[in-house]
């Protein structure tokens, strides 16, 4: 009775938020549900096949692809907005279905695994994110390792990431996937997360005196990009449930939006941490670029991570910088020999251009621009 009442009020709150404020309504619905019925996630997970997806980067696009694959096997519930905290999970689970494919924030994953008792957990990568919230990568990996040791779920992960290999070592059921190494050394993988010794890296392959290595795996593939890796991992997860392999247009997995502002035809990419900046910068092909850096809570207040990103590929391009921490970014570019113009806002930035422009936007800026 309590759950039924809580769901009624939550749906009403979500409908009101969507109708009157134009928002998705998922977040407020989940928040209301958990206030009125704190164990709603556990109750709504009973009798369902739950699949969880977590990572530093690529969660939303991979979850979307995996949900599409699973829809050929039965009814599927997933978050439409990418809300990945406990409230987003709760909101998604209010829709009845045979399967639930849910994106989960890295810090919330242990709680959600315990509450939902998933059949499978897909882990894509684990790299440095917002230090004020996530702390160091090893700390998150330790929490995941403890979580995996207590769960009956099958954990599927890319073991070219040494932190995920470390996590899987404690899982009773796992599928270890390798793509023949990373594109270079893991940015946070100088030492072994298991024993603390230096990892021996040869290209993207690693080994340690304690035995941690990606040279031995359950499945081996080749992939040219992070998007392709994630598509393959999603297929492996779906295959675990008997779903046949799907081919996907990789361009649909990118969080990129095209939109016109005045005379500028903008291709807007989301950039939220060092790994996503590196990937986005590698994809910049044009000569006109706008970079936006904010520092609100979800963006990350500490911008020291800018020094972990190589911006040298922007040399010689027409670069305009804006955002709340635009000065920090402009200085970082200056030190690396990238000429950039600092302007007060996005309108001023787009006024500098006509035609195609590539925009790399921080989390809050991205969603303000795409609506």
Language-model segment annotations:
Residues 51-72, 249, 253-255, 276-281, ...:
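Short, compositionally biased "basic patch" segments
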Residues 2-178, 185-187:
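Phosphate-binding loop of NTP-binding sites
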Residues 1-30, 46, 189-196, 210-212, ...:
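ATP-dependent carboxylate-amine ligase
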Residues 173-277:
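Adenine nucleotide phosphate-binding catalytic loops in nucleotide-utilizing enzymes
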Residues 110, 131-132, 165-166, 202, ...:
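Glycine/Thr-rich phosphate-binding loops of Rossmann-like dinucleotide-binding domains
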Residues 132-137, 236, 302-304:
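Short, solvent-exposed loop/turn segments at secondary-structure boundaries
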Residues 124, 156, 230, 234, ...:
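Residue-level signal for inorganic ion chemistry
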Residues 66, 70, 89-93, 233-241, ...:
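Buried hydrophobic packing segments
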């Amino acid at each position: 009775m309590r759950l039924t009442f809580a769901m009624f009020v939550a749906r009403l709150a979500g409908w009101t938020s969507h109708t009157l404020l134009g928002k998705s309504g998922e977040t407020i619905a989940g928040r209301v549900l958990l206030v009125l019925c704190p164990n709603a996630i556990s109750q709504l997970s009973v009798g369902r096949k739950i699949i969880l997806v977590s990572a530093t980067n690529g969660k939303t696009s991979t979850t979307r692809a995996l949900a599409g694959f699973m829809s050929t096997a039965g009814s599927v519930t997933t978050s439409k907005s990418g809300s990945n905290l406990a409230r987003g999970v709760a909101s998604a689970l209010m829709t009845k279905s045979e399967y639930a494919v849910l994106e989960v924030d890295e810090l919330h994953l242990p709680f959600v695994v315990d509450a939902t008792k998933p059949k499978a957990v897909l882990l894509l990568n684990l790299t440095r994110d917002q230090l004020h919230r996530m702390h160091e990568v090893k700390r998150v990996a330790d929490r995941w390792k403890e979580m995996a040791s207590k769960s009956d779920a099958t954990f599927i992960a890319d073991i070219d990431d040494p932190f995920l290999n470390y996590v899987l070592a404690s899982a009773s059921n796992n599928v270890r996937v390798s793509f023949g190494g990373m594109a270079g050394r893991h940015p946070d993988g100088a030492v072994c997360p298991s024993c603390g010794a230096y990892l021996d890296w040869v290209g993207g392959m690693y080994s340690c005196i304690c035995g941690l290595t990606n040279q031995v795996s359950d499945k081996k593939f080749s992939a040219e990009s992070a998007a392709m890796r994630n598509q393959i991992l999603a297929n492996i997860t779906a295959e675990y449930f008997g779903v046949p392999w799907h081919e996907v247009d990789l361009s649909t997995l990118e969080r990129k939006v095209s939109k016109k502002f005045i005379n500028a035809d903008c291709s807007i990419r989301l950039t939220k941490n060092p790994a996503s900046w590196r990937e986005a910068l590698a994809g910049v092909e044009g000569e006109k670029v706008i970079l936006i850096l904010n520092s609100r809570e979800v963006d990350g207040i500490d911008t020291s991570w800018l020094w972990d990103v190589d911006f040298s590929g922007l040399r010689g391009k027409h670069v305009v910088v804006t955002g709340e921490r635009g000065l920090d970014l402009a200085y970082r570019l200056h030190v690396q020999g990238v000429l950039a113009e600092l302007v007060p806002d996005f309108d001023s930035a787009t006024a500098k251009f006509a035609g195609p422009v590539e925009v790399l936007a921080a989390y809050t800026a991205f969603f303000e621009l795409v609506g």
